[in-house]
Amino acid sequence: MISSLEVADQLADGKEFYAVLGDMKELGEYSKEFHKKLGKKCSEFQNLKGLYTFGTDAFWIQEEFVKRTSSPRFSEHFPGTQEGLSELIHKFLQTIPEGSIVLAKASRGIQLERFVEALLV
């Protein structure tokens, strides 16, 4: 996941970008630790203007990001439910400027492609 963020940062070429990150599955007892490490790493990308997280364990990504950043950067967490997905899509469309660089990444089990498909309609 960190490699994907690095690529998004390179593609942004000094401009702002946004990330929508979901749970990393099958981490077992290391899940909380790895999600928090990812949140810390996200905070180090100075051009990452906004972070949305989706799913149960992804909360720790957002929590760590919030601890280490300040405005004008923002983040918001959504539960990994159909209602949470609908709220994420609605909030994203209201907030993120058209044409922005966006990374959407999660374990396959989260089905984050539903988010991407909704944007392509």
Which residues does each predicted region cover?
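ATP-dependent carboxylate-amine ligase
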Residues: 1-121
